[in-house]
Swiss-Prot record:
Protein name: Vascular cell adhesion protein 1
Gene for this chain: Vcam1
Gene3D superfamilies in the record: Immunoglobulins
Record's comment on post-translational modification: Cleaved by the metalloproteinase ADAM17 to generate the soluble form. Sialoglycoprotein.
Glycosylation sites: N273, N424, N531, N561, N650
């Protein structure tokens, strides 16, 4: 009994251990055993375990092909992702999980298919009643093709059914179709065609995947019984209106197109409406009009002829048969049709040159605007008016001219009496310049006339001039210089266009030699007033300019008044003064010398050592004069037999060892431009005493001192006066005695 219990206990222990192990480590796979995946979709295979903290996973196909997917393991779960699913994913996949020494494995079969779109219904052409047409039902991109079945229904009636079991399956996507030919009838309108495709993916599953397309039948009938109605009539007058209506039968309802048959048989499309209305009919509107009914399966047409009868009309053109237009202005040519409601206009030049203007048509009037007018616009213009089948033309001649500005007078320089001058009369921007005449007049006298007719004209604006040289005189002042320009027209105007410019002549006369008045005298005494007055004749009146001539010959301007005044003259005012008369015609000048004289009280006659000397003494007689230019000093000794001029040095005369015969009257004469002055003194020479050998020492010393001091004093006085007084004269020169 105990042995049996032990055996039972041991067996139960082993079973418990096995049960515990089986509970501790399990593997599961999802989806289970088998799954379907559509090509292009995403597929997840999940392998998970229980009873193991850190299992390891591995995936493989049963035939060891590539997985063609991505594996992601997290803890006790591993996922194989196939994105997108392709043919390479059709396998049996095995997931192996290992936990320590234990290993478990699960497998799953992945089958793939492709059935992504609804079938398509295609027709070989439009469904026209009574005409056979082929309809095709297509199932695109299918796999496996051997499990496909296609059915085609018209309404509830099965037209055809087809499967593809006999076709060899391929590892590829295929498009299969079912084709049926049938003849549409009127009763098919609004019926539906149904194309149904079935894919039996799992042979054990009797329910297939199914897709279908439904298309309502659009049945057509070709247009027929096309008819035209015309109101009011097919025969019309110019300016009248007509309405034509067209109708046609067919399915779908035909579109109506109106055309006109041209002379060459070509149809000119006019309208896409059932009703065609023509207003203000013209002659050219006559003809055959065609109505055509058109739909997808056919067309039907009919025609009608309209006859439009003409009526007379005239054309007027303004402003006339000829018009003159200035360059830069605007001119409007107007062409009007009378008796035609809807005329058509065209403009051209007689030489078929380009039109440079703007054409505007409004009703029965057409205008051609030339703005701005240029020389290229000079043409004969033709306006052609078409009224139905009739044409009329009118011509207008446009003459272009340019004469925008008055002439310009240019003179080569100022007008000076007796001096030749060139006058230029310019006429700017003239056209046509070969019709230009230029005349130059002085007062009422024609100086020169020129007609440019002989020059070759060009199609451009040109500037022309007339030039001449004449010598103006003083008598021309106040006269008018006139430049007269005339532009002659060819035929349009009897009188030429005129422009003129006038310039009053003012002839300049150069200043004559000035006249100078000096009051009271050109040699006044120092301190007295002096007025220098100048005048000069000329035109315009000369301006007066007083200047002083410097030692270097240059002129120092002093005044622009006619009178130059000195209130109190000074010695330095002496000099040459120049008066200039100045105007635009020239300069004239004259000079005068002003000499300022010193007063006579400055003359002194002295003797050294005294007027009474002894025989043998040295005597110095001196004559001096201050602040007097141009002075002559003459020392003389009066005698009964005649005056004896003494040879003086700087106004001094020295008697060495005076003798009794040296006694007498000595005279100093000073001469200037205004007169002379005299000074005199008497020298007394006494004879020696008995002791002839006696010579006083004091007298000897005095003699030597005087011989040195007196010349020194004279030199000092000379240089001082020369330095302080401008214009003073050296007494050295005064020794040149004048008798």
């Amino acid at each position: 009994m105990p042995v049996k219990m032990v055996a039972i206990f041991g067996a139960s222990t082993v079973l418990w251990i096995l049960f515990a192990v089986s509970q501790a480590f399990k593997i599961e796979i999802s989806p289970e055993y088998k799954t379907l995946a559509q090509i292009g979709d995403s597929m997840l295979l999940t392998c998970s375990t229980t009873g193991c903290e850190s299992p390891s996973f591995s995936w493989r196909t049963q035939i060891d092909s590539p997985l063609n997917g991505k594996v992601k393991t997290e803890g006790a779960k591993s996922v194989l992702t196939m994105d997108p699913v392709s043919f390479e994913n059709e396998h049996s996949y095995l997931c192996t999980a290992t936990c320590n020494s234990g290993k478990l494995e699960r497998g799953i079969q992945v089958d793939i298919y492709s059935f992504p779109k609804d079938p398509e219904i295609q027709f070989s052409g439009p469904l026209e009643v009574g005409k056979p047409v082929m309809v095709k039902c297509l199932a695109p991109d299918v796999y496996p093709i051997d499990r496909l079945e296609i059915e085609l229904f018209k309404g509830d009636r099965l037209m055809k059914k087809q499967d593809f079991v006999d076709e060899m399956a391929k590892k590829s996507l295929e498009t299969k179709s079912l084709e049926v030919i049938f003849t549409p009838v009127i009763e098919d309108i609004e019926k539906a065609l149904v194309c149904r495709a079935k894919l039996y993916i799992d042979q054990t599953d009797s329910i297939p995947k199914e897709r279908e397309t439904v298309r309502e039948l659009q049945v057509y009938t070709s247009p027929k019984n096309t008819e035209i109605s015309v109101h009011p009539s097919t025969r019309l007058h110019e300016g009248a209106a007509v309405t034509m209506t067209c109708a046609s039968e067919g399915l779908p309802a035909p579109e109506i197109f109106w055309s006109k048959k041209l002379d060459n048989g070509v149809l000119q499309l006019l309208s896409g409406n059932a009703t065609l209305t023509l207003i203000a009919m013209r002659m050219e509107d006559s003809g055959i009009y065609v109505c055509e009914g058109v739909n997808l399966v056919g067309r039907d047409k009919t025609e009608v002829e309209l006859i439009v009868q003409e009526k007379p009309f005239t054309v007027d053109i303004s402003p006339g048969s000829q018009v003159a237009a200035q360059v830069g202005d605007s001119v409007v040519l107007t062409c009007a049709a009378v008796g035609c409601d809807s005329p058509s206009f065209s403009w051209r030049t007689q030489t078929d040159s380009p039109l440079n203007g703007e054409v505007r048509d409004e009703g029965a009037t057409s205008t051609l605007t030339l703005s701005p007018v240029g020389v290229e616009d000079e043409h004969s213009y033709l306006c052609t008016v078409t009224c139905q089948r009739r044409k009329l033309e009118k011509t207008i001649q446009v003459e272009v001219y340019s004469f925008p500005e008055d002439p310009e007078i240019e003179i080569s320089g100022p007008l000076v009496h007796g001096r030749p001058v060139t006058v230029n009369c310019t006429v700017p921007n003239v056209y046509p310049f070969d019709h230009l005449e230029i005349e130059l007049l002085k007062g009422e006298t024609t100086l020169l006339n020129k007609f440019l007719r002989e020059e070759i004209g060009t199609k451009s604006l040109e500037t022309k001039s007339l030039e001449m040289t004449f010598i103006p005189t003083a008598e021309d002042t106040g006269k008018a210089l006139v430049c007269l320009a005339k532009l002659h027209s060819s035929q349009m105007e009897s009188e030429p266009k005129q422009r003129q410019s006038t310039q009053t002549l003012y002839v300049n006369v150069a200043p004559k030699e000035p006249t100078i008045w000096v009051s009271p005298s050109p040699v006044p005494e120092e301190g007295s007033p002096v007025n220098l007055t100048c005048s000069s004749d000329g035109f315009p009146t000369p301006k007066i300019l007083w200047s002083r001539q410097l030692k270097n010959g240059e002129l120092q301007p002093l005044s622009q008044n006619t009178t130059l005044s000195f209130m109190a003259t000074k010695m330095e005012d002496s000099g040459i003064y120049v008066c200039e008369g100045i105007n635009e015609a020239g300069i004239s000048k004259k000079s005068v010398e002003l000499i300022i004289q010193g007063s006579s009280k400055d003359i002194q006659l002295t003797v050294f050592p005294s007027k009474s000397v002894k025989e043998g003494d040295t005597v110095i007689i001196s004559c001096t004069c201050g602040s007097v230019p141009e002075i002559w000093i003459i020392l003389k000794k009066k005698a009964k037999t005649g005056d004896m001029v003494l040879k003086s040095v700087n106004g001094s005369y020295t008697i060495r060892k005076a003798q009794l015969q040296d006694a007498g009257v000595y005279e100093c004469e000073s001469k200037t431009e205004v007169g002379s002055q005299l000074r005199s003194l008497t020298l007394d020479v006494k004879g020696k005493e008995n002791n002839k050998d006696y010579f006083s020492p004091e007298l000897l010393a005095l003699y030597f001192a005087s011989s040195l001091v007196i010349p020194a004093i004279g030199m000092i006085i000379y240089f001082a006066r020369k330095a302080n007084m401008k214009g003073s004269y050296s007494l050295v020169e005064a020794q040149k005695s004048k008798v």
